[in-house]
Each structure stands twice: as C-alpha cells, then as structure tokens.
Amino acid sequence: MPQITLPQGTVRYEEIGAGPPVVFVHGILVDGTLWDLVTPRLAGDLRCVVPDLPLGSHRVAMNADADLSPAGVARLVGDLLAALDVEDVTLVGNDTGGAISQLVALDHGERVGRLVLTNCDCFEVFPPKEFVPMVLHQVAELRLGAEGQDLGRRGR
C-alpha cells in the first residue's frame, strides 16, 4: 500500500483507476476498506484515492503532536490533496468522514469541486451526543498510540 508523509505523520492510501480524482473519506473506527466494493466499479473512469485516516483503524501512528480533532483530520485531508497535487476533486464522505469532508470543502475549497455525503454526521449532531464519550476516549487512545508509536493492534 502506498504511503505519503504529511506534516501530521505518514498516511497509507490506496489508489486505483485513472481520470478525474475522487477522494473517499471513511468514518471513525473503520479504514479505507469501507470503499472496497465501490472503487473497483468506478476505476474505469475515475482516479479513486482512499486514505486510511487516523480515526481509529489506521495502522501507522501519527506524530505525537498531530491534531487529531475533526478539524485537525480535515487539515490532514487538505494536506493530502495538496501532496497528491489534485484539484477539482470529488470528495466523498461517509459517517464521521462526511463531517470531516464538509470541513475540508470549507477550508480547501480551491481543491474541492464536488462534495458527496453518504449517511453522515453533520450540523449540530456531530458527533451524535451518544457518541461523545466514545469519541473523546478514542482521541485519547490515539494520542497515547502516537506517543508510544504502538497502536496496540493485533493481527493483519
């Protein structure tokens, strides 16, 4: 799997197809494999880029000082778009990735041509109140993993 070094740390990503760029943004506690049934169907006409974002199921720890808040992850996605030198991107966000994609579109609109939101968090319900304790715990765990560079993952 290709990797790219960004100011926040190293991000793994998959890339398939050629054509106008589409970047897929997954939600919390999943990784880019969420899009495995989607991207092969689009790859004939589109360049599909699927990063593994630091939202709980990534395999490479971020730098200890990386901002892993939603706004920080949105900056990371913006930095990824810049590093890949893509413009007029179709940004597709699911779940928490939809909320992050909205932030990317606001802050990096010069690179985003279209925004597709699928079953996602948005507006005043991000994160949903029931998930606030889990999200705060997950961010704390991610920080600990980054500091020790050991995310405590097993297998795969």
What are these model-predicted stretches?
Residues 9-60:
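Conserved HGGG/HGGXW glycine-rich cap/lid loop of the alpha/beta-hydrolase fold
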Residues 93, 97, 101:
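Gly/Ala-rich beta-loop-alpha elbow adjacent to hydrolase catalytic centers
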Residues 126-129, 146-156:
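Conserved alpha/beta-hydrolase catalytic His-Asp/Glu region
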Residues 34-36, 59-66, 126-129:
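Conserved catalytic-core motifs of eukaryotic protein kinase domains, centered on the activation segment
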Residues 9, 21, 45-47, 85-90, ...:
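Structural signature of beta-strand start/N-cap positions in the alpha/beta core
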Residues 102, 106, 112-144:
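Flexible "cap/lid" loop of the alpha/beta hydrolase fold
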Residues 7, 16, 49-94:
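Active-site loop/oxyanion-hole signature of alpha/beta-hydrolase fold enzymes
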